[in-house]
């Protein structure tokens, strides 16, 4: 029967079918010592269905063989007055065939009698239940009363064995996973056996929960045991039972990629979640909380356990119950809200292990579960809501807790950024304020938190890989030259799109920041200029240092480099580590790396150049086996690189400031203002084009012109204060500015036009006198463009007071 390719296989199947139909197998129970036949019968049947892939042809054992064997074994169980414990062991062992730990053990140490695995199960990524598992499940379902009794006795024996010293136990110890328990070594071996039994219980609940009706009360008793190991194990087990999670483990976490493009929308999010295979799909045939209410209530009380490890385990499994909706059986609204409140309380636990476990649990939720489950009691700014308490953890006193919390909170916002940009409720009200909570941690004045915020900003909130810079070209049958032409034709458009897509993410972030967070955001951006100067000095010193090889002035060069390294190191939490890294980088003396860092900082570098340079720098450092250096170099590049104030972003920012797409105009205008005042160099590439736009849109006495010109004037005004020589000097441009000062419908536009004119014109006195004369001509309160002329006069009094005074006299 184990070899379907056998010439007599049809006859073998016929004999088995006849045996199952006639039930003559019951005769063996009347023999003396029937167990000597019954035990090999069960072993042989399970071996046959599990060893089918060993057939010479690779042909599978027929399904009717499995079916008839099940009927034969059920008949034996029904007719046997007493079932040998070995038979029960064989049956329940089949449920461990889907346990990755057992398969790993069998692969390393050879197959065990209680955990035989056929060759198609050698991988951990099983796709379906093995035949032996299905046979054992069918037997338990066909003989519920007998199997309930025998399985209860089986687990009772295991629990009794675990309650006495290891030297007095009399049952074989089977290999199992090493539990994460905190008790003594003497108890450890027995807890291992008990841990294996608890894994079996998880799978039996999924397969045939009826046989566990007498076992669950025993686990409930373990919840109140003195042993921490027992309480921990029982808490984990009941939590997984309620969540419908079997021995194969929980399903993989939903995708939460902050750099995914296009950004996923809430309405489509569930469609992006890959369906796990049947082994990992949570299934609870019955609602555990209703069938075993007493045990479930005892489990809920473990959130108050005196031992942190038990509370941490409780936080983990309660998250699974919420994620799986109690194994698919569903949670009542009040019950779900209660679990969310309890999980939120774990985020404020006095023990850091519990807080870390609760934060990690929240990190397992996908966008739809965050919105519809975790967000039921409010968003990041709702007092005492789960998301608000998670936001508190970004300032946790323990570094590993705040790091996890900040990354998870940032990832939530990043995945939801598309919906936040579109002002989609309830996503906006729940998660819009997440970046504000992260930037608020900046005020702790902790260098470690500052570095963490840098990482979160450029790796999660605004990841360098968002959006993908290179468009994936499909491999078609078209000629290579045609592809090249298409690529060249579409490349400018793709670059523009990349910049616009990224700018929309940046402006969405900026739009949602509160006033305190906004100040932090712009302080971080303004820091780029000072850091750029410092890093430039460092790179120049590295070049003089020449990897430690000198021709002259050795002491002076070393002293100069040491001074700069010390200055840069003070901005890191571990100054000694940062100093060592910067010295090592100088000794490596990779000139290409120096150039790459300069590319990332240069105001003339577009975003594509900055990202490529950053990635190449990271690759070069890793290839040279200097990966630890990135702990210092990455934050340094994030702080000095042109990652947000970037020249290729300017057209997209200007466009959004005019079109107000998705309500981003105000944020775009504020960004332009900050760029023009803090880092006007990035405007240099666009300033000539901006000035041409101003000329084209200039108002006249008969028309007010384009209102969107105000934003361009504001940006040019900031640029003119720092780099006036870069602006055009043509008379046509100055005439356009004069027209803005006199005829614009916006007083602000008039003010900015006067500022540009006074900063750039060689004959500004002449223009000032001319403007004053024209402003006061036929100028009475309430006259046409009264406020525009008033704004122009006030600005002239500030910037050209002598000429204004002369005319006023």
What are these model-predicted stretches?
Residues 1-168, 185, 211-213, 217-222, ...:
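Long internal repeat-built scaffold domains in very large eukaryotic proteins
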Residues 30, 80-84, 121-385, 404, ...:
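Alpha-solenoid helical repeat scaffolds
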Residues 302, 312, 346, 397, ...:
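Residue-level signal for functionally critical sites in structured catalytic/ligand-binding pockets
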Residues 382, 389-404, 408-426, 437-441, ...:
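Extended amphipathic alpha-helical scaffold segments
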């Amino acid at each position: 029967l184990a070899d379907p390719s056998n010439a007599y296989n049809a006859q073998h199947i016929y004999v088995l079918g006849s045996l199952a139909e006639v039930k003559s197998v019951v005769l063996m129970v009347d023999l003396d010592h029937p167990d000597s036949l019954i035990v090999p019968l069960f072993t042989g049947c399970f071996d046959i269905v599990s060893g089918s892939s060993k057939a010479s042809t690779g042909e599978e054992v027929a399904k009717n063989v499995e079916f008839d064997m099940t009927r034969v074994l059920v008949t034996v169980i029904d007719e046997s007055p007493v079932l040998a414990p070995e038979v029960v062991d064989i049956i329940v062992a089949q449920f461990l065939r889907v346990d990755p730990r057992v398969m790993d053990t069998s692969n390393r140490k050879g197959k065990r009698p209680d955990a035989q695995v056929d060759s198609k199960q050698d991988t951990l990524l099983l796709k379906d239940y093995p035949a032996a598992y299905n046979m054992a499940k069918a037997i338990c379902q066909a003989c519920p009363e007998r199997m309930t009794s025998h399985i209860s006795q089986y687990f009772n024996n295991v629990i009794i064995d675990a309650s006495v010293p290891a030297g007095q136990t009399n049952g074989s110890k089977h290999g199992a996973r090493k539990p994460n328990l905190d008790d003594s070594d003497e108890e450890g071996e027995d807890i291992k056996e008990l841990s294996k039994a608890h894994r079996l219980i998880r799978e039996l609940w999924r397969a045939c929960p009826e046989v566990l009706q007498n076992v669950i009360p025993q686990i409930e008793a373990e919840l109140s045991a003195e042993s921490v190991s027992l309480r921990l194990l029982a808490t984990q087990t009941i939590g997984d039972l309620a969540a419908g999670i079997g021995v194969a483990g929980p399903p993989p976490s939903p995708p939460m990629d902050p750099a995914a493009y296009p950004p996923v929308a809430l309405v489509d999010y569930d469609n992006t979640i890959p369906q796990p295979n049947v082994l990992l799909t949570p299934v609870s045939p019955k609602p555990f909380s209703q069938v075993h209410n007493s045990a479930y209530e005892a489990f809920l009380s473990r959130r108050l356990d005196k031992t942190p490890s038990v509370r941490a385990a409780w936080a983990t499994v309660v998250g699974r119950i919420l994620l799986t909706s109690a194994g698919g059986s569903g949670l009542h609204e009040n019950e779900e809200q209660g679990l969310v409140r309890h999980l939120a309380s774990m985020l404020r636990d006095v023990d850091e292990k519990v807080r870390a476990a609760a934060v990690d649990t929240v990190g397992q939720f996908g966008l739809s579960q965050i919105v519809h489950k975790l967000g039921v009691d409010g968003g990041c700014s709702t007092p005492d809501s789960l998301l608000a308490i998670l936001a508190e953890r970004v300032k946790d006193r323990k570094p590993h807790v705040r790091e996890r919390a900040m990354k998870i909170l940032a990832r939530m916002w990043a995945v939801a950024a598309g919906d936040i940009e579109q002002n989609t409720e309830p996503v906006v009200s729940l998660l819009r304020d997440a970046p504000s909570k992260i930037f608020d941690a900046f005020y702790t004045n902790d260098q470690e938190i500052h570095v963490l915020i840098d990482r979160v900003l450029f790796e999660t909130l605004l990841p360098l890989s968002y959006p993908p810079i290179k468009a994936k070209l499909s491999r078609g049958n078209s000629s290579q030259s045609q592809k090249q032409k298409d690529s060249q034709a579409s490349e400018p458009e793709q670059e523009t799109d990349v910049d616009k897509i990224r700018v929309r993410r940046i402006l969405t972030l900026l739009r949602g920041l509160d006033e305190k967070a906004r100040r932090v955001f712009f302080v971080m951006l303004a820091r780029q200029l000072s850091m750029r100067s410092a890093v430039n000095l460092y790179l120049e010193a590295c070049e003089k240092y020449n990897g430690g090889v000198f021709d002259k002035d050795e002491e002076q060069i070393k002293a100069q480099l040491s001074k700069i390294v010390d200055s840069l190191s003070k901005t890191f939490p571990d100054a000694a580590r940062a100093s060592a890294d910067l010295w090592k980088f100088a000794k490596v003396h990779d000139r290409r790396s120096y150039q790459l860092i300069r590319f990332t900082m240069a105001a003339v570098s577009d975003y594509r150049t900055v990202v490529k340079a950053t990635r190449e720098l990271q690759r070069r450092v890793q290839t040279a086996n200097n990966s630890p250096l990135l702990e210092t170099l990455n934050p340094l590049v994030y702080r000095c690189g042109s990652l947000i104030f970037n020249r290729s972003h300017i057209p997209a920012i200007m466009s959004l400031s005019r079109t107000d797409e998705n309500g981003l105009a105000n944020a775009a205008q504020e960004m332009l203002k900050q760029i023009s005042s803090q880092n006007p160099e990035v405007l240099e590439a666009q300033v000539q084009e901006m000035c041409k736009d101003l000329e084209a849109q200039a108002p006249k006495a008969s028309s007010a012109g384009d209102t969107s010109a105000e934003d361009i004037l504001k940006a040019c005004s900031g640029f003119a204060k720092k780099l006036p020589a870069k602006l055009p000097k043509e008379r046509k441009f100055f005439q356009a500015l004069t027209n803005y000062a006199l005829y614009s419908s916006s007083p602000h536009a008039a003010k900015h036009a006067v500022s540009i004119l006074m900063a750039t014109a060689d004959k500004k006195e002449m223009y000032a006198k001319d403007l004053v004369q024209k402003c006061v001509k036929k100028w009475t309160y309430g006259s046409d463009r009264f406020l525009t002329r008033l704004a122009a006069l006030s600005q002239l009094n500030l910037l050209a007071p002598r000429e204004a005074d002369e005319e006023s006299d």
